[in-house]
A protein has these predicted regions:
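Repetitive helical segments and hydrophobic/amphipathic motifs
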Residues: 14-15
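Bacterial N-terminal signal peptides that target proteins for export
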Residues: 1-11
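Sec/Tat signal peptide C-region and signal peptidase I cleavage site
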Residues: 18-22
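Compact, glycine-rich, soluble single-domain proteins
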Residues: 23-153
Length: 153
């Protein structure tokens, strides 16, 4: 019984020390492709946090600046604003999608075309206020139609 007890203690201690990033799952990550000379695009995904957390930033090697944004309608005018912290409620999936929350890639270093993969590093603030990172590979899809993102920046 002593051996079993020790094993359980080791398992519990290991589970308690699992990094917070292991509690955040990212699915269906994609980036909208760009056309020649385009300097911005959006990244979209589904984020689920088991314990509850906040998305507080992001980085990518393909862009000079990366920000979390929210797009909304205000009196028939599309508005975009930077979001310093996006809540990730425990056990709920937050969808970053066109026309809503998204990760904005600004000052692109190269065009992004269908079939490319874009590395993203999401910065997650945990309940204890520590910040961890989640590495994501987002597939590039076809470029936006002319009506999408028009006049947003």
């Amino acid at each position: 019984m002593n051996g079993l007890r020790r094993t359980l203690i080791v398992i519990c201690a290991a589970a308690a020390s699992v990094p917070a990033w292991a509690q955040v799952e990212v699915k269906a990550a994609w980036v909208r492709g760009t056309v020649a000379a385009q300097k911005t695009t959006g990244a979209y995904m589904e984020i689920t946090s088991a314990q509850g957390a906040r998305l507080v930033g992001a980085e990518s090697t393909v862009a000079g600046t990366v920000e979390v944004h929210e797009m909304s309608m205000d009196k028939n005018v599309m508005r975009m604003r930077t979001v310093p912290k996006l809540e990730l409620p425990a056990g709920k999936t937050v969808e970053l999608k066109p026309g809503g929350y998204h990760v904005m890639l600004i000052d692109l270093k190269r065009p992004l075309k269908r079939g490319d993969s874009v590395p993203l590093r999401l910065k997650i603030e945990n309940k204890d206020k520590t910040v961890s990172t989640v590495e994501v590979k987002a597939d590039v899809r076809d470029a936006a139609t002319a009506s999408e993102h028009k006049g947003a920046h």
